[in-house]
Structure formats: C-alpha cells, structure tokens
Curated annotation (Swiss-Prot):
Chief place of localization: plastid
Keyword Chloroplast on entry: yes
Protein known as: Plastocyanin
Binding site for Cu(2+): H38, C83, H86, M91
Compartments where located: Plastid, Chloroplast thylakoid membrane
UniProt family annotation: Belongs to the plastocyanin family.
Stated role: Participates in electron transfer between P700 and the cytochrome b6-f complex in photosystem I. Has antiviral activity against Potato virus Y (strain N).
Annotated membrane topology: Peripheral membrane protein
Cofactor(s) essential for the protein: Cu(2+)
PROSITE patterns on file: COPPER_BLUE
Source superkingdom: Eukaryota
GO CC annotations, alphabetized: chloroplast thylakoid lumen; chloroplast thylakoid membrane
Amino acid sequence: AQIVKLGGDDGSLAFVPSKISVAAGEAIEFVNNAGFPHNIVFDEDAVPAGVDADAISYDDYLNSKGETVVRKLSTPGVYGVYCEPHAGAGMKMTITVQ
C-alpha cells in the first residue's frame, strides 16, 4: 500500500506526498498525521470519466492522529483530491492510477 499523510510532520496543511502513482486496485492509506480535522474529497471535475467521485470520497473528518482511511482505485487515469476544510490553504493532491 502507498501511505499518504494528512498533514506534514512540520504541522503544514498538506497531503504528503502531494503526488503519487499507484497500480489499479492498489491500496492507498490516508493517515491523519497531525490531529487536525481532515477529509478526503475526490474532485468530481478531476476524476476519469465514469468514476463517481462521491462514492470514493471520505467526507467525514478524521480528527485524531493515526486515524486511517483506505481507498482502492480501479479506473486508470488522474484523480484530483482535496481536503475540504483546508482546500483554501492549498491542501490538494494528485493520484495517477496506472
């Protein structure tokens, strides 16, 4: 699995790393690293055609350090992801599924 931290070790509001590549069906573990409330929203305008962004998003907040959400993406292409409360601070990432 690929691990993506929600929040940098330095307390930054960021996905770390901000770009990953995965094989179709490979697990992606989103882990709250900082204890700030974060969520994982797939941008409906930035996912491959036919993908239901709402179905793969995790809208609830991960509030505690160590809380984890796992997603597996099966449709190849590029996915845009953001954290709803911190999108204005630039908390966004890109996932490329091979």
